[in-house]
Amino acid sequence: MSLQFGPEYVRAIAPYVTGKPISEVAREFGLEAARIVKLASNENPLGMPASARVAMTAAIDGLARYPDANGFSLKAALHAKFGVPEAWITLGNGSNDILELAARALVAPGQGVIYAQHAFAVYALAAQEVGARAVEVPARDYGHDLDAMAAAITPDTRLIYVANPNNPTGTFLPADAVAAFLAKVPPTVVVVLDEAYNEFLKPEQQYDSIAWVRRYPNLLVSRTFSKAYGLAGLRVGYGIAQPQLTALLNRIRQPFNVNSLAQAAAVAALSDTEFLRRSAELNAAGYAQLTQAFARLGLEYVPSSGNFVLVRVGDDADAGARVNLALLRQGVIVRPVGNYGLPQWLRISIGLPEENAACIAALESALAQAEAAA
């Protein structure tokens, strides 16, 4: 009889599946890596800010030393940007780290964690890894049904994840809807407001979530430098909450969870408003390029407030996987989302104009092949 290690709720976890890296697709399909277009992981097609590269170069000589465990310089920069005390800030190895720290710090086995259907897969994983009672609330129009999520709260609920904008669907919750929801949540239940794609919001969509943090001791706002700031490979994110919450998160986080290069780059990127402006401008143009093509091809898509678009590529349960494979063979990497309960859909990150054009051409070819085979 084989040994079984660990609790059953850990053994039951299905590992998180990342977007395929370029090197893997090149090996698998015999393609030239330089010709592969990756639009799978919602990365910034502009790359990293030049200011971040300069900051990292200056920090290289210090790599024999451990990083600043408290992240003084980065917390000071975040304090200057948001006006919150440094004690309200927790640094993470990407915002994934913050999302998981919240579950580990706040939820005991058997207690409830609420999240929406079609929301970021890490919410369910974070709940599973602590043995929580995971409650997936059915989506409304591919996004969060906040009324239903509030109604799902029970006396043993300890944590609620809300993404705004949502990944992988791109849906957006207006400020008044989020404010009304926060007012309904009992003070014993912590809300994690995941704003990984906040920097892509249009001016008319923007709201002040930090004002909510000042009002609600049970609110944790998480953000990342992986998306708009172009630092995905460095893994740096942060959470902002009142000190009762951050003290708990900091008790269980790894002491050196954000490396020296990441801290230096994030400080530089945070003040690079011109890079953010260019990123948002490129994203808006790319969104128009992709969605106009989808409309021309007769494809349904979900209006997105992020740097990606969810598009329906067929009606049968194998449509997403089939079209995804056809795209891979042409050297285009996108994200199938069958694991999100959306097997007919693909999530396509917004890239450079030429990358978007290559994706559109490959998608048109893949759809034509599927139609011919039908």
Curated annotation (Swiss-Prot):
Catalytic activity from the UniProt record: L-histidinol phosphate + 2-oxoglutarate = 3-(imidazol-4-yl)-2-oxopropyl phosphate + L-glutamate
Gene name of the record: hisC2
Family, per entry: Belongs to the class-II pyridoxal-phosphate-dependent aminotransferase family. Histidinol-phosphate aminotransferase subfamily.
Cofactor: pyridoxal 5'-phosphate
EC class of the enzyme, as a word: transferase
The protein's name: Histidinol-phosphate aminotransferase 2
Organism this protein belongs to: Ralstonia nicotianae (strain ATCC BAA-1114 / GMI1000)
HAMAP family xref list: HisC_aminotrans_2
InterPro entries noted in UniProt: Aminotrans_II_pyridoxalP_BS, Aminotransferase_I/II_large, HisP_aminotrans, HistidinolP_aminotransfase, PyrdxlP-dep_Trfase, PyrdxlP-dep_Trfase_major, PyrdxlP-dep_Trfase_small
